[in-house]
Structures are given as C-alpha cells and as structure tokens.
C-alpha cells in the first residue's frame, strides 16, 4: 500500500530490491490504503505503538522544479507555513517567500533537440513542516507552468467511496486462505518480530494480502514520524493546482499504481518481508530520515546505491532474479514510460512542470539518462 516509500524496510545498507525507493515512488497510493487500514482498525494509534504518531492521511506527494523561470503567485493566499487541510479550501498558488529554506531538491531544465524546454523536479511523497514555504525556484517553476505533470492525481480518487470500497475488497483474501499460507516461514517470522516493535501481533494481519501488509508497514513508519503525506510535495502541488484551475497531467494513474502493487508476485513480497530480519522501528525510522536528508540536498544517487559483495552474499540466485523483476516493474519500466511522456509533452511545446518521485531520475536507466540518450540536454538547477 504504500508504494511506495522504496521500503525503508530493508536492512541497513541492504538495497537489493531498492525498497526505500518504493516509499518514494508510490506513496500516493499508500495514502488511500492508509485510510482504509485505519478505518478497519488494523493500524494502531499512538497509544498502541508508544509513539506520538500523527493521524493517517489520505493523499501523497512528488515534485520537481526549474531554474530560469520567474513569476508571481497566481492568487492571494500565502504559503508561508506548512500546508494543512485548509489548503484544499483555499485558492492560493505557491508563493515566493524564501530563496531555498535549506531545501534544494534535484531539479533540471531539460531541452529537446528542437529547442523546447521543461522543468523537472524529483519529489518526496511525505514531507515535514520545515519544507515550507517551498524554495523560490520551485515556486517559480510551478507558477510559470500551464500544466502540472504528476505520477497520478489521487486527490479525487481518495474521496470516491465506491472506489475505496472496491479497493478494500482487494486487500483481503477471498479464497479462505491467509497470509501465512502465501509466504515462507522465514518471511513470516521476520514480519512477526518486526511488528512486535510496533506493539502489533501478526495475527491481526493474517486476513490481508501481502500488498496490504506491506502498506501497513509503511503506514506505521510514517505515522510514528515527523513526516506527513498531506505535506508531501505532490499532494501540496496537486491541491494548489486544483484550487488555481491549473491543468493536471497524469503520467500514470491511480489504477496503474494500484494494479502494480496488487499484482506483484508472492515471491516478491516474500523477499521484501524477509529483508525485515534484524530491523527495528528505530532502524527503519533512521533509514527514512537518511533518504529525506539526501532528497533535501538533491542527492538522488543515494536512492539507488548498489549492494556490495558482502551484502549480496546472503541472497540466492533466485532471490536476485526476484529482486531484478521487482526493480524493473517498480522503477526501470516506469522510468521508460515517464521519459516517453516527457518527450511527448515537449514535442507538443507544452509549458509543463514535471514532478515525479526523485528516485526515477537517478542513475543509468533513470529519466535523465534516458532523455540524454535520446538527444535531450539536462541542466541541473542551481539554487
């Protein structure tokens, strides 16, 4: 359910499935799942987890920006403080209240072979109060764009009762089987131990399919932190764009992301759950914090650091094949589609602010690499 933090659920330094990236790339969908799980009473509140967790949220975020644009806010209200639920009731655009606010996420000005340009920004789907107001370069990129391109627009789907009802049905087994029958004893044991750190017993999740269990883990992590999906970059920009009447372009869709999570094989989730062995609440919170620190400074390569030989030693060849399948579906195949969408928009001369998860831009096979191989140039924005 979550897509999508690339799960911080990996062992420290264990990146075989690039799980932490999940957290960053599909958290949009995770927000809907969070709401569903909380409505079922399966996600413990702060009294159950001994934490000061925040209430579950229902939306997510991703973002990117440009370097040469300048512009004024398109409406009256100010973004001088972190966005809260009231932002959806305002008609405010993002405003230029600060230069960087100590936040300098990776952002590019991309130019096509024909000379058309686009501003691209790497987002983080759950952020903190300290991220607002947004950096001036980001606000300028938003204010000067005619179109906001995002992975998907969850703001309307999350309020669709029928859609959420159908999604809830897909979270549960309907064949009289249970979780322990679909994953290995090793994976089940690792999950059971990890959930204990959150004051949960795995028996509470036996009726849920692996993708719903995975999302529950992400939900627990976010709720017990300073992060909030409502303050995520995508969610903030989407809410603002709707209020401003700005056109929104979905590179993917909520259905696409949900279907991907739902249809991952049991083998993928088994490997994912096994990676919780040795993990604790604190180690996962620190892993998420480390990713956030990297995002703040524009260090996107950290999201895709490779395993060394020692880290890979504990994995079988079959595990490595499963991890490769996961990474292709979660990251590299989507990168190709995202790059193609960007090229199509630029070929039409559209004035677009293109905001997707930061990990999608990183390294070989990332969006920037794919665009450059097709003859596009990408200039990193200097704040």
Task: Give residue ranges: language-model regions.
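N-terminal low-complexity, Pro/Thr/Ser-rich intrinsically disordered segments
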Residues: 70-110
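Sec-dependent N-terminal signal peptides of Gram-positive bacterial secreted proteins and lipoproteins
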Residues: 19-44
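A cross-kingdom marker for long, charged
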Residues: 319-383
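Short, Lys/Arg-enriched N-terminal segments with co-localized hydrophobic residues
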Residues: 1-16
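Phosphate-group recognition and catalysis centered on beta-loop-alpha active-site segments
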Residues: 47-48, 54, 76, 87-93, ...
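Bacterial lipoprotein signal-peptidase II cleavage site
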Residues: 38-65
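Structured, acidic catalytic/metal-binding patches in enzyme active sites
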Residues: 95, 106-326, 330
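Extracellular/periplasmic catalytic domains that process cell-envelope and extracellular macromolecules
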Residues: 101, 112-113, 346-348
């Amino acid at each position: 359910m979550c897509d999508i933090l690339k799960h911080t659920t990996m062992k420290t330094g264990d990146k075989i499935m690039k799980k932490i990236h999940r957290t960053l790339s599909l958290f949009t969908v995770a927000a809907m799942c969070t709401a569903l799980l909380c409505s079922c009473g399966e996600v413990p509140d702060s009294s159950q987890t001994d934490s000061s967790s925040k209430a579950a949220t229902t939306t997510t975020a991703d973002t990117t920006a440009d370097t040469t644009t300048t512009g004024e806010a398109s409406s009256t209200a100010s973004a001088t403080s972190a966005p809260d639920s009231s932002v959806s009731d305002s008609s405010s655009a993002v405003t230029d209240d600060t230069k960087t606010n100590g936040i300098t996420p990776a952002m590019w000005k991309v130019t096509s072979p024909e000379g058309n340009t686009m501003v691209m920004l790497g987002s983080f789907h759950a952020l903190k109060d300290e991220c607002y107001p947004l950096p001036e370069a980001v606000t300028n990129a938003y204010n000067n764009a005619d179109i906001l391109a995002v992975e998907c627009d969850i703001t309307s789907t999350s309020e669709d009762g029928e859609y959420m009802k159908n999604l809830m049905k897909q979270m549960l087994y309907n064949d009289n089987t249970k979780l322990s029958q679909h994953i290995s004893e090793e994976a089940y044991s690792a999950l059971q131990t990890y959930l204990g750190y959150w004051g949960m017993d795995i028996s509470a999740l036996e009726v849920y399919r692996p993708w719903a269990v995975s999302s529950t883990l992400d939900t627990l992590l976010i709720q017990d932190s300073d992060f909030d999906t409502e303050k995520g970059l995508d969610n903030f920009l989407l809410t603002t764009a709707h209020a401003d009447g700005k056109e929104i372009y979905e590179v993917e869709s909520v259905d696409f992301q949900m279907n991907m999570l739902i249809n991952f094989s049991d083998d993928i989730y088994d490997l994912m759950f096994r990676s919780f062995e040795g993990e604790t609440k604190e180690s996962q919170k620190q892993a998420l914090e480390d990713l956030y620190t990297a995002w703040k400074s524009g260090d996107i390569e950290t999201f895709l650091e490779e395993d060394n030989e020692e880290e890979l030693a504990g994995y079988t060849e079959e595990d490595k094949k499963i991890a490769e399948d996961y990474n292709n579906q979660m990251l590299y195949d989507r990168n190709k589609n995202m790059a193609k969408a960007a090229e199509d928009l630029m070929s039409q001369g559209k004035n677009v602010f293109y905001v997707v998860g930061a990990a999608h831009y990183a390294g070989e096979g990332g969006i920037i690499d794919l665009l450059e191989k097709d003859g596009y140039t990408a200039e990193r924005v200097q704040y």
